[in-house]
């Protein structure tokens, strides 16, 4: 039975008619010769025009405005934590550090952290982070906490 099995690597062939040769145009009158599928006369019959060419109309890349301004390479980006998030993470109060926030999953490690003043706070927190906004500092100290900025 194994000798008659046609499913062997050397017997595999594509189905008849599945593979057809590419039509070579412009090779004689009988087979798409003469104009070779380009129609008669005109620019596109004589040579290839770039796809981006818009027929003399102002091209898209020249119609669009240029970018303005610049990107400051010395900009410092902070991960933001608001006061309402801190009250949810530390309901009994306590010491807030960058490492503690990373451990609780509030921020990613190896980047600066800034506390902003959105929300209210009623417990005393000892906050030690890279930066704190003015409103957050006022609210934390009013609640009996302390603020230490690392940067």
From Swiss-Prot:
SUPFAM superfamilies: Ribosomal proteins L15p and L18e. Signal peptide: none annotated. Gene3D superfamilies: 3.100.10.10. One of its GO terms (biological process) is translation. One of its GO terms (cellular component) is cytosolic large ribosomal subunit. InterPro entries: Ribosomal_uL15 (IPR030878), Ribosomal_uL15/eL18 (IPR021131), Ribosomal_uL15/eL18_sf (IPR036227), Ribosomal_uL15_bac-type (IPR005749), Ribosomal_uL15_CS (IPR001196). Keywords: Ribonucleoprotein, Ribosomal protein, RNA-binding, rRNA-binding. Residues 1-60 are annotated as: Disordered. GO terms for molecular function: rRNA binding; structural constituent of ribosome. The keyword Nucleus does not apply. The keyword Isomerase does not apply. Pfam families: Ribosomal_L27A. Belongs to the universal ribosomal protein uL15 family. Part of the 50S ribosomal subunit. Binds to the 23S rRNA. This is Large ribosomal subunit protein uL15. The lineage of its organism: Bacteria, Bacillati, Actinomycetota, Actinomycetes, Kitasatosporales. The gene is rplO.
